[in-house]
A protein has these predicted regions:
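Rossmann-like adenosine-cofactor binding region
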Residues: 29-119
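NAD(P)-binding Rossmann-fold cofactor-contacting core
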Residues: 17-34
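Rossmann-like dinucleotide-binding domain for NAD(H)/NADP(H)
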Residues: 79-82, 86-184, 195-266, 273-278
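Glycine-rich adenosine-cofactor-binding loop
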Residues: 1-16
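Short, well-ordered beta-strand core segments
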Residues: 22, 50, 126-128
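Charged low-complexity "KEKE/polyampholyte" interaction tracts
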Residues: 186-189
Length: 279
């Protein structure tokens, strides 16, 4: 992870809970939580999965503008998964095109030069979204609550007069019996049929995570919509419109999962992933 601010810290905690080895680069942070390793930028970029979450600034001695350029891009492995969900200006378009030419899998939410982004780059990334950032139903509710608190304080009125009850829960029944099938979307590498029980167990957990996450936000559908609209008019206004009219979606914490049969291991991994309730 490049950046250990609010988002980077929360993501690191989630990944550690899921059993991942997490390395973090952030020159402004000197203490990290248990299970997280603080490393130099080159070591962070050398990981199999690299995800950017740093703020964008030009302040020395550690400017982040164009942090990953034609020089540092060489630190990234050819077989890596590279995600930018931080700021578009953290990496140059040239660096991303270089990565794509080497076979690196690119998942891009924040783009260099946005809203005027590279059509060539869009065609080369595995998953593309229009700077969704923290947009969700929960974010809208929280922002509204913040305004309500100020309104109540300023006008001296009762919260009950202005605050409405909003149900955020998303119920889901998960059929455990079908989770060991190799039917996970092609974007995920899975073991073949007949592999060891340990691999089948891992596949079951992977499928459970995939179905749970897709129940609240399907990035494959977001990617398809982005490409369809963008290709019809690849201009700045299209990108801005996609951001402004992004569909409402829930967060995984809203999900309430009922398993079709008792599986403590699935309860553990779904809870670690942030599912609100599993039983």
């Amino acid at each position: 992870l490049v950046g250990y601010g609010h988002v980077g810290h929360a993501l690191a905690a989630r990944l550690v809970a899921l059993g991942a080895r997490v390395m973090v680069y952030d020159p402004f942070v000197h203490n990290v939580t248990a299970g997280v390793e603080h490393v130099c930028l080159e070591d962070a970029l050398g990981c199999p999965i690299v995800s950017l979450h740093a703020s964008l600034h030009g302040d020395y001695p550690h400017p982040s503008q164009n942090l990953i350029d034609s020089t540092r891009v060489g630190c990234i492995r050819d077989d890596a998964l590279f995600i930018n969900a931080g700021r578009g200006g953290l990496v140059t378009t040239g660096a991303l095109l270089d990565l794509a030419s080497r076979g690196v899998t690119l998942v891009i939410d924040t783009w260099p030069g946005e809203p005027k982004i590279s059509a060539e780059l869009v065609s080369k990334v595995a998953l593309a979204t229009p700077h969704i950032a923290g947009y969700s139903t929960n974010a809208k509710i929280n922002a509204t609550d913040y305004l309500i608190d100020s309104l109540v304080s300023a006008l001296g009125i009762s919260e009950s007069e202005v605050r409405a009850d909003v149900t955020d829960e998303v119920p889901m029944v998960l059929d455990v019996s079908g989770l060991s099938r190799v039917d996970t979307p092609a974007r995920v590498d899975t073991p073949a049929r007949g592999d060891t029980l340990a691999q089948i167990d891992a596949l079951t957990k992977l499928n459970a995570l995939d179905k749970a996450i897709s129940a609240v936000s399907c990035i494959v559908e977001d990617d398809a919509h982005f490409r369809r609209v963008w290709q019809s008019a690849p201009v700045s206004q299209t990108f801005e419109s996609l951001r402004e009219h992004y569909r409402l979606r829930h967060q995984i914490s809203d999900l309430r999962v009922t398993l079709s049969e008792p599986r403590p291991d699935l309860v553990q991994i779904l809870t670690a992933a942030g599912v609100g309730h599993v039983h």
